[in-house]
Amino acid sequence: MKKIFFYALGLMCALSAQAAVIQVTSDKSGTELQEAINGAKSGDSVLVQAGTYYGNFTMKEGVNVSGGWNEDFTAQTDYETILDANADGRVLEQPSNFTTLTVWSNFTIQNGNLKAIRSVPASGLSSGVALGKKGQVKHCLIQNNTFSYNGNCMGGGVGNDSIDAATDVCAEDCIIRNNCGTHGGGARVRGTLLNCVIENNNTNNSVKKGPAGGVHLQGGRMVNCIVRGNLSGGDTGGVRCWGKSQIINSLIAGNTATGKVGGVGIENANSDIIGCTIVNNDQLVNDASHNSKCGISCGATSDNGTKLANNVVWGNKHKGVVQEAQVYYISHYAAANRIYNAITHQNTTNGIKLSMNNDENDTYTDNDSNEQTGRAPHFADPANGDYRLTWQSPMLGRADSSIAVVTKDLDGNNRNIEGVDLGAYELPYYTLTIAAFDHATLTIGEDAYTAGEYSVPMPKGYTATATIAPAEGYSIKSVKIDEDELEAVAGVYTLPAVSANVTLTIEIQQDKGTAIDNTKANTKAAKQIRNGQLLILRDGKEFNVLGSQL
C-alpha cells in the first residue's frame, strides 16, 4: 500500500519506459522515502519536500534524489530537507561502485554515529556520507556526524573511495562542518572535493584520535575549497596528502594540530599545491625541531616530484608564535622538486626563509625575492579571516600563469586580469571610463590622458587621485563620478575607492574675455564688430579675435 501511495503522489510520467519524477511529501517517514527510492528505476528522479526524515539511507544507481522542494514542488531551497540518522549508524551510503553518475543534492545530512565497522562501499568510511565511484553529493550541508567505537571512521562528514580523482567529483558546493572522524574530521577522499567549505571538524575523539582535522586526501584532489578552523588529534590540522594528491586554488586557514604540521602535510608520495593561501595555522607539538612544519611539511619520497607553486604561506605558528620558517621540505629525489613563485612569512631582514634539507641539488627559486623582502601580503582583514588581497599587495600579478590551472579564483573572479595573483584570491579589477573631453590634460597617478575617451582598469579598493590641467583659455566647469560631483582640494581630485565600474566626466569651458591666439597674425588692422554685424572667416585666413570684442 505504501508504494501505491507514493506513486499516486508522485508519478509525473506515464508508466512506461520513460523516466519518472517521483515526489515525496513531508508527511512521509524516512522509511517511506527509502521505499520510493528502491521502487525507482535508473533515470528516474526523486523530489523530496522540505522536512525531516529519520533513518539510514541508501543510494540507488542512476536515481538522482534532490531535497528542499516547496509544497507544490515548484521551487527549491538548499538544506531545508533534513536526513537525520538520530545518532544511530551512517546517514547515507552508496552500496557499491556505480557506472552511472548518481547525485543526491540540496539536503542537510546530519547526526550519523558509526558504532561498528562497515565495509560498504569500503571499510571504515564516514558516519555521514560514504561514497564510491560515480556517487556524488551536491549543495548539501553535512554536519554533526561522529563515531563511538574504537575503529576507523575515515572522513567524519564525507568518506569517498572513488577510483579516478581527476574525473570523480564526490562532493560539490557542500558545507562540511562539525564532524568527527579518524582520518579527516571533515572528509577523506580519493576523488575530488570541488567548491566546498570544510570547517570546525576534528579528529580528536576521546575514543580514537587521528590525523587531518580537516581533509585527508588519499590520492585525491581538492579544488576551490576553504578548509578552516579544524582540529587534529594528531598531526596535520588542515589537509593531509597521502598518495599523489593535489590541492588547487584553496584557502587553508586557522587550523590546529595537537601534533606537528598546522596547515598541510605531504606524506608517503609527492603532491602538488598550486595557487593556495595557507595562513594562520598552528601546531602544538612540544618538540621545537618541528617548528618549521607549521605551514607546509613536505616529506615526499617519490621521484615524481612535489610542486609548490603560486602560493602564499604566511603567519603560521608553533604554539601561537609565528615562525620564521614556514615550509619544511625534504626529499630523497631533490632534483625533481620545486618551490617557486611563493611568498612566505619572514621575521628577519634575511628575506624569505625556508627550512630545507642540506642538499645542493635542491632547487628553490623565488621571483623578485629581494623586492618582496620584508613586505607583508596586505590581506583585506586577516584578523577576521578575510585573506582577500588589497591593491597594495606585492602578490598581485606575481604568479606563473602557465601553472594557474583554474580560470576562476575562490570568489569566482576571473584569473589573469592584470597577471595572475599569488594565492587563492584574485584582486578584482573594474573599469574607469573617462568620458570624452577636450582642451585639458588629465593625470591619474603617473598616467596622463589628453583629449579623448578612455577605459582604464582599476583594482578594487584603489583610491586614485587626479589633477586636471586645462589648456590656455579654458577652465574646469565640473568633474563627476557617475552623477556625483567631485571637489578639488588644493587642485587635487580624490576619486572614491573602486568597487564597481564607474564613469568620470570632465566638463571644460572656455573662459570669457580670454584671447585665443593663432599661429599666424592678421596683417590687417583690427576691426570692431558692431551689434548686428556678421563676421565671415574665409579659408586660408587667420585672425586674432579678442574676447572683449565679441
State where each predicted segment sits.
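Right-handed parallel beta-helix/beta-solenoid
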Residues: 16-35, 42, 52, 377-385
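N-terminal extracellular ligand-recognition/capping segment immediately after the signal peptide
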Residues: 27-34, 44-73
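Predominantly extracellular beta-rich ligand-binding scaffolds that present long acidic/polar faces
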Residues: 55-64, 103-106, 117-124, 128, ...
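Right-handed parallel beta-helix/beta-spiral solenoid domain characteristic of secreted/periplasmic
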Residues: 63-118, 374-377
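Surface beta-loop-beta hairpin patches that serve as ligand-binding interfaces in beta-rich domains
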Residues: 393-430
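Surface-exposed interfaces of beta-sheet-rich extracellular modules
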Residues: 405, 462-491
